UniProtKB/Swiss-Prot annotation:
Membrane-traversing stretches: 111-131, 133-153, 173-193, 197-217, 228-248
Membrane topology: Multi-pass membrane protein
One GO term describing the cellular component: endoplasmic reticulum
Resulting phenotype, E70G: In YIP1-41; lethal; abolishes binding to YIF1, YPT1 and YPT31. In YIP1-40; temperature sensitive; reduces binding to YPT31, and inhibits ER vesicle budding
Family (UniProt): Belongs to the YIP1 family.
Keyword entries, A-Z: Endoplasmic reticulum, ER-Golgi transport, Golgi apparatus, Membrane, Protein transport, Transmembrane, Transmembrane helix, Transport
Superkingdom field: Eukaryota
Xref: Pfam families: Yip1 (PF04893)
Role this protein plays: Required for fusion of ER-derived vesicles with the Golgi during ER-to-Golgi protein transport, probably by mediating correct membrane localization of YPT1.
Protein name in UniProt: Protein transport protein YIP1
Compartments where located: Endoplasmic reticulum membrane; Golgi apparatus membrane
Length: 248
């Protein structure tokens, strides 16, 4: 190691001063890479943190998995497949769950299932030669807002009951109970419904959706002997979609 000596500038002629060998720095004593690497390794071992790389591969890239210690993406955004399956079963077999609906299912505001059902309804109409995606989502949005406000007016004066009734709860219930009308639109692909048989079948599917949705809302609002009163506006709401399948 050399440095410029300013004190003996006149004697040495302004040159560089080379220290003796006894003051030389030993080789490798200032190797920062080894020191930092060893300290980091010691800290990692002390903290118990192990290397945690992401899995590689095209399948992992398209999946919703992240690091092993992190929750899945679907869980973080609130999509629960168990609730989706349970709600779908309740709509398909309403008599089986006639004793009561769990409060956890009623308070679930999942909209993944309703969006899928409305998309299937539009696709089935498209396969039947009817393009009504704008009408479907427009009527669904306007009807959900109207039925939510009406349900709040019909709910009890209990504060806890009113706080449980949120807009997305109403939208989730109406969307899941829309599933029978998807079967109606699927039937319209293979057979025309603008006849007496089609009218009867459409009425049955509308009643199916109305009965299940009124049961959900009646349990959520904790009303007594008011299911038929709730069912009347729901019947009108689902009848609009049945008319799309038959006439439009």
């Amino acid at each position: 190691m050399s440095f410029y000596n300013t004190s003996n500038n006149a004697n040495n002629g302004g040159g560089f001063y080379q220290p003796s060998a006894q003051f030389a720095v030993p080789q490798g004593s200032m190797s920062f890479q080894n020191t930092v690497g060893s300290s980091n390794t010691g800290n990692d071992n002390n903290l118990g943190v192990a290397p945690d790389p992401l899995p590689v591969g095209i399948l992992h890239a398209l999946s919703t998995k992240g690091y092993p210690h992190e929750p899945p993406l679907l869980e973080e955004i609130g999509i629960n497949f168990d609730h989706i399956i349970t709600k779908t079963k309740m709509v398909l077999i309403p008599i089986r769950f006639g004793s009561g609906v769990p409060q956890e299912i009623l308070n679930d505001s999942d909209l993944a299932g309703p969006l899928i059902f409305f998309l299937l309804f539009g696709l089935f109409l498209l396969m039947a030669g009817k393009v009504h995606f704008g009408y479907i989502y427009g009527v669904a949005l306007f009807g959900t807002i109207s039925l939510h406000n009406l349900s709040k007016l019909m709910s009890n004066n209990d504060t806890s009951t009113q706080t449980n009734l949120q807009f997305f709860n109403t939208a989730s219930i109406l969307g899941y109970c829309f599933l029978p009308l998807c079967f109606l639109s699927l039937l319209g692909i293979f057979h025309g419904l603008n006849n007496t048989t089609g009218y009867v079948v459409s009425v049955l599917f509308v009643i199916w959706s109305t009965w299940t949705s009124s049961g959900f809302l009646n349990s959520l609002l904790q009303l007594q002997n008011a299911r038929l009163l709730i069912a009347y506006p729901l019947l009108i709401f689902y009848s609009v979609f049945a008319l799309m399948v038959i006439f439009v």
